[in-house]
Amino acid sequence: MTSYELQEFFGMKGGVEWLQTWEGMQWSFRIAAGLLMFCAHTVYGKVILMTDWSKEPKDSRPSKGTWFTWAAMDMTILVFMLMEGTATSMVAVDGTINVIIFLIALWVGTNSWTVVEKGCVCITLVGIALYVTLGNTAPGLLCACVATTSGVIPTWLKERSTPGGEDKTAWMLWMASCVCGVIGIPGLLEPSKWTVANVAQPLAFTIVCGSMTLLLFILNPLFPLSRDERASVEG
């Protein structure tokens, strides 16, 4: 639990009665989002650690560049949300474990780093520069979230052209975490109360996980690409 989640936990009144209110249920969903995020990363991390990568095709290994990009973007989002007091267990778990997976990727991963991923890091740096210049976290957070939604493109294309590289269980858990995170947005039913600090991260993560879930569970199984089509996607 982080930021307002801790405040709500220690400041709750009525215990079980409070948890039965809409605000209490939203708090529960935010906690569930963090737990599901942890489970998803655990599944993914276990695959990375337990696989004998010396026997696997090189292009199936985790990418150092990819995980550096995810770690940089998500830690930036976490820092900005901490500064605004809106960080949740979901983004805290995601940012922290992405750094750990990046460190593991340094050991077993490939050196690939796509143009899109480099662009995402640049967008994130622009966001940091805007914060330093303007003294406002909103532009920086928006840039980091835009970079996050764009950062899934290389992973999506790779899985579309070469199915089987992504773990379905992990992505299913990530998607469930995102759904809980969106339900837990403070003031969800009152759009006038939405802020960049509360809304941008859950929606950005949902776009990322939703696109991958659609690919893994619908597009690839029901509409597989031919060899020529895969080659065109890879190109």
Task: Set out the residue ranges of the language-model regions.
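Alpha-helical membrane-protein topology signature
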Residues: 2-235
